[in-house]
Amino acid sequence: MKISNKKDQNDPTKEEIKFILELLNSNKLNEARKEIDKQITKYVNSSILFNIFGALFAAQNQLNNAIKNYQKAIKINPSYAQAYNNLGVALQKLNKLDDAILQYNKAINLKNDFPEAYNNLGNAYLDLNKPENSIEYFTKALSVKPDFADAYNNLGTLFSDVARFDESMLNYKKAIELSPNNEKYYNNLGTLLNTLGKYDEATTEFNRAIKIKPDYAKAYSNHIFNLNYITNLDKNFYLSEAKKFGLNCKTIKKDFLAQYQYEKEPKKLKLGFVSSDFGNHPGGFFTLSALRELKKKNFDLIAYSAYDRKDDFSPHFRPLFLKWHSIEKMKDDEVVEQIFKDGIHILIEAQGHSAKNRIPIFMYKAAPIQLSWLSTGTLGVAEIDYLIGSPHMTPQDEENHFVEKIWRLPEITQCFTPPDFDVKIKSLPASRNHFITFGSVNKSAKVNDDEVALWSKILSSIPNSKLLLKNRDFDSQKIVENTLARFEKHKIKNHRLILKGKSQTRKELLEIYNEIDIALDPFPFQGHTSTCEGVWMGVPVITLKGDRFVFHSGESINTNLNMHDWIAKTYEEYVSKAIKFSSDIDLLSKIRKTLRETALQSPVFDSPRFAKHFSVMLWDMWRKFIKKSTKLEQL
């Protein structure tokens, strides 16, 4: 932490200040607090001490106390630029972005060569989704301090967010060059490489981050999530990497096991849901309708929101929960204390190793039963009791892929929430175009070389057919050029491909299916969300039967739609089915007219049916826990 170079008789000596800062930087917070308390009795009007006191509270995540002390420092010394900057940081952590920006500007007005304040201002505008403002201030930070690694890193993140991937790459690499021991920069570069479909290179960067910080949970999660994209992955390797996460990121400070107090036969079970996806996100689409139905049953639902989304879908969630805890700014042990205080019976991890997860919370075992739902495979955490499976997602011969015990629902692992607005299904595109349009509405990272080869065979086998690929990644000219070049290697000309970027609304996204005759499911990391959206829009999906959790979702959906003939067992069968179905325009037209209604009545969309099975499962888990606990008591 920086402090003002100026001091007067109201401030401690440089040696005294240095000693306190060394304690703070060594994370010896209790010792630092004692030293500050001692010094502040001697220097009651020290702006520097109150600024440091604020930093101490900020390190303890006591942001309101931090703010009070920064304000005291400013009251004593209204020209204290660093205190204004620190006040802005605390306000930004509380999502008071306009107030934070005001403080950063005050700091800059007092000290116009203040790179940290410019950098923080850029981050605040990034949080406000104003990238042009962010670019301006990150650039200003670098003009003042050309070797400012963090500003380069932030530019890398900004450019990645707006699909300017070449510039993102350059800035991340510059940050690493300037600060080669910062694990966050390698993690961010790995995330970018995953977006670009460079899975092996991404793995290298995630491992570099982990080597620097062996308990770096975010890099571990990104590494494990990245493995989902790799074709022919050794399942034992995935399991071993997940187990490393479970062991190396475990920093338990309190044992809750002996402290549980619960009724053996409660009238309602308290269910805690931990997720960053309560909003316009695939995780939100797969939870909303189920939560609506569970609320009607004998459960109290409590949310632990790891990221409060602000979109047109997020307002549907809060009314479903008895309590809503925003945990994004809370430390793991603080969240765990809240979970224990709430008396949760069953704690549900509802997103897996995707972005902004809080899986380490589950290592504390703050609830009697913990389970994984909506993940892409094992979480690797021994303290999680169960992973929710189904006959097709978790076949018995794959149980050894998981750390958790598998608890199978009878039909499907998750239920999709249809949009609450109508999108008209138009007639079959082929009947208008006189050629077949295949499509995949998925991240470009899911389009691997095996798929490109397979989809090229399909296009080569069906004259005049086209392939539509849509995702915000295709707003990047680099990804467009790379995609065209990859297909050209298989003699597929550019005019056979239709590449479309980001949609402004979800309705606009769904309307793209009116341009697709047959959807092609990617593999091994299959579509799931795009498959459900496609069938709701009347578009059937050819999928490949796989050999691991993420590689089973298409099979599971099509099985529950009674569309068994659309599941291929081999690459050759995948191609032959595409050829067969594309030649039967009458069948495709019939499917288009009936598939939405069929889907809505199937387990894929039938939320009351799903919630019934889910409810039985939860109560059976509780009774099993009570029975086991009673036996232990008798021993």
Regions found by a protein language model. Give the residues of each.
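Catalytic cores of eukaryotic secretory-pathway lumenal/extracellular enzymes that build
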Residues: 497, 501-503
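Short acidic/histidine- and often glycine-rich active-site loop of Leloir-type glycosyltransferases
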Residues: 551-562
